[in-house]
């Protein structure tokens, strides 16, 4: 995985250049944008975080955050603002922002927020990869295997072959055969692991 990037969006050129220069000196990879629209036009779901000015023309910070949430862009956001108040900061945090920093702020505070955001982004992406891998395993199942798997997930304390067979109108021997195939295809060894895998898919 490539190094994470700080995506900096601020309509004031002096703020962009000052912050970009300071962050690069601290070893961060930085991409700067003068507007939310410019960022959206160029962003390719790269990992990192977004340092976002609250009060911008055209699309402001909260509007961009809302748009990203609607379109499932999970890049963590750190708001910076020279005139945002408590209501705005509360709204941003409720919508998932990492933090809301009032200008002027200490560079050390921003750096700490960036590290937190990078950690959150990594966790989110790893969870998405695990979910996709789990879904791919379930896609290996036939319709009958999926039916039996669903029964076992919904009735983890009642997975005897006779009970499953009675519920699905098939023989216990057929249940045993399908159960073995289910565990093999899902790369698991027990009903407990089946339930855990299903929880990953549904997360």
Each predicted region: which residue ranges?
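Conserved acidic segment of CheY-like receiver
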Residues: 2-15, 19-23, 36, 50
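Acidic catalytic/metal-coordinating carboxylates
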Residues: 34-35, 60-63
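Active-site beta3 strand of CheY-like receiver
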Residues: 45-52, 56
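C-terminal output helix
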Residues: 85, 101, 105-114
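Basic, Lys/Arg-enriched C-terminal extension of HTH/homeodomain DNA-binding domains
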Residues: 180-203
């Amino acid at each position: 995985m490539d190094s994470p990037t700080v995506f900096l969006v601020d309509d004031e050129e002096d703020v962009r250049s000052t912050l970009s220069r300071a962050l690069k000196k601290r070893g961060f990879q930085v991409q700067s944008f003068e507007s939310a629209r410019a960022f959206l036009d160029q962003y390719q779901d790269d990992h990192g975080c977004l340092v976002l000015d609250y009060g911008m023309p055209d699309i402001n910070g909260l509007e961009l955050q809302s748009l990203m949430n609607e379109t499932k862009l999970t890049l963590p956001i750190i708001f910076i603002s020279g005139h945002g108040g408590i209501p705005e900061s509360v709204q941003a945090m409720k919508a998932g922002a990492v933090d809301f920093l009032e200008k002027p702020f200490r560079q050390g505070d921003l750096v700490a927020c960036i590290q937190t955001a990078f950690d959150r982004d990594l966790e989110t992406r790893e969870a998405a990869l695990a979910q996709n891998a789990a879904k791919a395993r379930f896609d290996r199942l036939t319709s009958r295997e999926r039916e039996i798997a669903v029964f076992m997930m919904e009735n983890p304390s009642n997975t005897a072959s006779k009970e499953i067979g009675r519920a699905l109108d098939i023989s216990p021997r057929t249940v045993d055969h399908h159960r073995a195939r289910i565990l093999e295809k899902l790369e698991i060894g027990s009903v407990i692991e089946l339930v855990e895998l299903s929880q990953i898919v549904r997360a």
